[in-house]
From Swiss-Prot:
The gene is NDUFA13. This is NADH dehydrogenase [ubiquinone] 1 alpha subcomplex subunit 13. The keyword Phosphoprotein does not apply. The chain crosses the membrane at residues 30-51. It is a single-pass membrane protein. The lineage of its organism: Eukaryota, Metazoa, Chordata, Craniata, Vertebrata. Pfam families: GRIM-19. It is found in: Mitochondrion inner membrane; Nucleus. GO terms for biological process: negative regulation of DNA-templated transcription. Belongs to the complex I NDUFA13 subunit family.
Length: 144
């Protein structure tokens, strides 16, 4: 057998064209400097709006405090009236309960002073129901 002639593939005359191997990505978005400028601008605007809101909130808070200060004498007068009414009712109840005890002075202070001493919760609500005493000492805490 004779050796067969092998035909080898050869490039075309003049060679192959150049091969494009680089990535051809389109330019997307803003540049880094413009994004930095937008970020700084957003931060400055955010700080400005927070400062503006804090000033408004402080103004509203001062207004609330002034309203509370204006209403405080009225609220204190109501509390004093309620306290004196309860003390008067307690004295009447004490007179009824202790009428048979000799040498008992109704309304005698346990403190040896002539100054006004605000009554304790136990003094005010000693002759009241347990619910009233708990409500006075703890308020609305059991709702939360």
């Amino acid at each position: 057998m004779g050796a067969s002639k092998v035909k080898q593939d050869m490039p075309p005359p003049g060679g192959y064209g150049p091969i494009d191997y680089k990535r051809n990505l389109p330019r997307r978005g803003l540049s880094g400097y413009s994004m930095l400028a937008i970020g700084i601008g957003t931060l400055i605007y955010g700080h400005w709006s927070i400062m503006k809101w804090n000033r408004e909130r402080r103004r509203l808070q001062i207004e609330d405090f002034e309203a509370r200060i204006a209403l405080l004498p009225l609220l204190q007068a109501e509390t004093d009236r309620r306290t004196l009414q309860m003390l008067r009712e307690n004295l009447e109840e004490e007179a009824i309960i202790m009428k048979d005890v000799p040498d008992w002075k109704v309304g005698e202070s346990v403190f040896h002073t002539t100054r006004w001493v605000p009554p304790l919760i136990g003094e005010l609500y000693g002759l009241r129901t347990t619910e009233e005493a708990l409500h006075a000492s703890h308020g609305f805490m059991w709702y939360t």
